[in-house]
Structures are given as C-alpha cells and as structure tokens.
Amino acid sequence: MYKRQIQTDAISGFTDGLSIVKWQNYRSDGKPVSHATYPDTDIPLFRLAEAYLTRAEAIFRQGGDATGDINELRKRANCTRKVQTVTEQELIDEWAREFYLEGRRRSDLVRFGMFTTNKYLWDWKGGAMNGTSVASYYNKYPIPVSDINNNRNMSQNEGYK
C-alpha cells in the first residue's frame, strides 16, 4: 500500500491525497471471480436510491416535504440520524453520499448552481489551493469540433470559441 499524504500543497504526485476503493471484483460470497479479465460485478443502470433522491428533490423544489424519501434512504443505509427538514444543502449532501465515486457529482453540482460559483468550494477548484469560483461557461461542455463541422447550423458553446 502506498503511504499517502492527506494534506498537500500540490496535486502532482500519485500518493498525494486520499484513495478510495468502492467496487471490487469479488463475488458476493467473497470468493475470487471466475475470470480476472472480465468483472463478475453487475453494473446498475438506475438505482432505487436515484428514484428516491430525484423524487425528494422534485418535492423540495416545489415547496413540499421530502423528509420521507431522505429518511427511507438513510434507513436502508443503516443511518440512525433522521432529518427533520430537508434543505438544499441536505439534498446535495445526500446525492454525494449515495453516489460517491459514481461519476455524477459534476452534473449534480451544475443542477444545484454550485459547480462554477463560490457557493461550494473544494481544494484546487479554479486552480486555487483553497478553491475559487470559475467562469459560468464551464457548466456546459464544449461541443466536439467534428459535430460543428458536420452541422453548419451549430455553433460552439460560449467560452469555448
């Protein structure tokens, strides 16, 4: 195992920061997989947790009470702390906990208006050690040049021209 520095002034080394293992290629009974090249682990396309969180977010955004859905998720995860009221911060935190390292955090932050603003900062956001806001055009991806070349009616997203 690599010795890692949790606190760092640079992000250039392989052993800087934390590492997390979420998925492992073992069978549910703990035995090795049948073929080392191909995983035996199923990949969920849509999880029940995503349905609960999507509904909770919709209810919250319409001014309703989303505590039932959040507490149901927490119950399934053996979390004993129930929420009494759901806030925007509670929702974005629940999305982060439930889908940690599953590749959807950026879209969640964009949807909550936190990706480019100083409403939510992380180390090295915007190239600053303690984080800083960045230009709002980063909320969208650039359109591939090949797509633009194939469609004269299409133009590049602002900020990427």
Spans of features found by a protein language model:
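Hydrophobic aliphatic residue packing
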Residues: M1-Y2, L73
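Extended, hydrophobic/aromatic-rich amphipathic alpha-helical segments that build helical scaffolds
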Residues: N25, D42-L73, E88-E102
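Long, intrinsically disordered, low-complexity segments
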Residues: H35-Y38, I43-L45, K82-K161
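Plant-biased detector of terminal regions, especially N-terminal secretory signal peptides
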Residues: G13-F14, G64, D123
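Flexible, polar/acidic helix-loop-strand segments at domain edges
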Residues: K3-R47
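A broad, low-specificity signal marking well-ordered, structured residues that form hydrophobic/aromatic
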Residues: V21, I70, S107
